[in-house]
From Swiss-Prot:
Nacreous layer of shell (at protein level). One of its GO terms (cellular component) is extracellular region. Keywords: Secreted, Signal. The keyword Cytoplasm does not apply. It comes from Pinctada maxima. It comes from the Eukaryota. This is Glycine-rich protein 1.
Length: 423
């Protein structure tokens, strides 16, 4: 499936080349030779150079197809493993031949056997095999940086790191020795110097854990944004309950408290309580009812203020977490912006122009320019949506404070009604 997708990408990469040739403006014809002027306008990749001879054109396209073959080879680890085993067998044949020479056996048959085995290995020299492995490893690094899931089947438990480079992560789950690159799919490449510098001396490739930490930071930012939204929803639910309580008290209170109940928050509930207490006429019971109403009003006012303060603090906390989550989302958005297939097309074309992926890896500025394209717009979009979310959470907290104050004053209204019944 990976080969089919990359074949499609390779065919797409040819369109910008032909389109750039078609965009060249035709020039004037002078003395039997045509001259063309103008350059390609598209930004899909570098335009094909003008070839002076068929040999030069053949050399360019041969390099182009070689680069594409290297990309496929980076995703086909079985071939690499077979070549490695064959190279190991070639080394063993020389040892067997020398041992049989010491024992006085037939040298001619040993040489023919050794030659046959070397032919079965493909006849590749050590230089060709190492060049192929270097090219495949370079493409593996590029594909991982672009976000493709490249799993090295040979490294199930991970490789040890050197003094400056972290170990190469395997396909095992998080927590085991091979999970140095964040389980292979989420974290960065463990063999990069930036990820593993100073930590790669251990045998389990500890340097790659920097890549895993990057994935953890992304998950943390998501959890923070969810927490802010949850705080806002909780405050809104409290507001609904408070409003319902105040309305019920208004229906049970006397006519004098109706005006107070139409207000919002703690003031409405305290007015209902004092109205219920003072509406009764009697001897000692009237004074008792008024005192109970005043006491309930003061308790309700204090409770409302305390709840309002708590809600304000919660709103501020939600806004803070929302803004920090927005900053994290903006950073991750700018890093992950752009289409990985588009970038892969540009990298394949650039590697063809430079004569191979090894030359491209030696020029990190060109590679970084392609990697960082189209990232700023994605980051800005993420930051805008996060900011809107934190504002909504703050508004919900304020509404919750007003409603909760009304609910707390329900006890005051009940005390006034009891005093009236006592008369």
């Amino acid at each position: 499936m990976k080969k089919i997708c990359l074949t499609f990408v390779f065919l797409l990469s040819l369109f910008p080349i032909y389109s750039s040739q078609n965009k060249q403006a035709a020039g004037t014809i002078e003395s039997g030779s045509s001259k063309s002027s103008g350059s390609s306008v598209g930004n899909a990749g570098p335009a094909t150079p003008e070839f002076k001879s068929y040999k030069e054109e053949f050399s360019y396209w041969y390099t182009y197809y070689s680069v594409y073959y290297d990309v496929l080879n980076a995703l086909n680890d079985d071939d690499d493993n077979k070549d490695k085993k064959k190279n190991d067998e070639d080394g063993k044949t020389e040892t067997i031949t020398s041992a049989k020479k010491q024992n006085g056996d037939d040298v001619k048959s040993d040489n023919s056997k050794s030659t046959a085995i070397k032919k079965s290995g493909g006849g590749k020299t050590d230089g060709e095999a190492s060049k192929k492995n270097n090219s495949a490893n370079s493409w593996k690094i590029i594909l991982k940086l672009l976000g493709f899931n490249v799993v090295d089947k040979e490294n199930g438990n991970g490789k040890g790191g050197s003094a400056n480079n972290g170990g190469e992560g395997g396909a095992t789950s998080a927590g085991s020795a091979g999970a140095t690159s964040g389980a292979g799919a989420n974290g960065g490449d463990a063999g990069e110097t930036e990820a593993g510098e100073g930590n790669g001396a251990s045998s389990d490739g500890a340097g790659g854990e920097s890549g895993g930490a990057g994935a953890g930071a992304g998950a943390g930012a998501g959890a923070g944004a969810g927490g802010g939204a949850g705080a806002g929803a909780g405050a809104g639910a409290s507001a609904g309950a408070g409003a319902g309580g105040a309305q019920g008290d208004a229906e049970a209170a006397s006519a004098g408290s109706t005006a107070g109940s139409t207000s919002s928050g703690g003031a409405a509930a305290s007015g209902a309580s004092s109205g219920a207490g003072s509406s009764d006429s009697g001897q000692g019971a009237s004074a008792g009812g008024a005192a109970a109403g005043a006491s309930a009003a003061s308790a309700a006012g204090g409770g409302g203020a305390a709840i309002g303060g708590s809600a304000s603090a919660a709103s501020g906390s939600a806004a803070s977490s929302g803004s920090s989550a927005g900053a994290s989302a903006a950073a991750s958005g700018s890093a992950a912006g752009g289409n990985k297939f588009t970038k892969l097309i540009k990298i394949v074309q650039m590697a063809s122009m430079m004569g191979g992926v090894e030359n491209l890896m030696e020029n990190p500025l060109a590679l970084q320019m392609i990697m960082s394209s189209s990232g700023a717009s994605a980051g800005a979009s993420a930051a805008g949506s996060s900011a809107a979310g934190s504002s909504a959470a703050g508004a919900g907290g304020g509404a919750g404070a007003a409603g909760a104050a009304g609910a707390s004053a329900x006890a005051g209204a009940g005390a006034g009604a009891s005093a009236r019944a006592g008369v």
